[in-house]
Regions:
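Ubiquitin-like/PB1-type beta-grasp interaction modules and other compact soluble beta-rich domains
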Residues: 1-72
Length: 73
């Protein structure tokens, strides 16, 4: 018997295969990556503004890039 309450999707976060509970948002992926701000986020090479992270639904196979700015000299 298949339990529909534990459905997951597989996405890529910074080139690492990751399973998230479905439905999943970009915010869920960021939480799974345990990344601290500041950073920029893109899904399938498209920048997603921070205000949209909680509403941006992910699909299986999405490629998420979380980019941290480089500082220093």
């Amino acid at each position: 018997m298949h339990d529909m309450t534990s459905a997951t999707i597989q996405v890529w976060i910074n080139q690492i295969s990751t399973e998230l509970n479905a439905p999943a948002t970009l915010s869920d992926a960021i939480a799974a990556a345990d990344l601290k701000p500041p950073f920029a986020a893109a899904v399938n090479m498209q920048f997603v503004p921070k205000k949209n992270h909680a509403h941006h639904l992910l699909q299986a196979g999405d490629k998420i890039e979380l980019i941290v700015p480089v500082t220093g000299g």
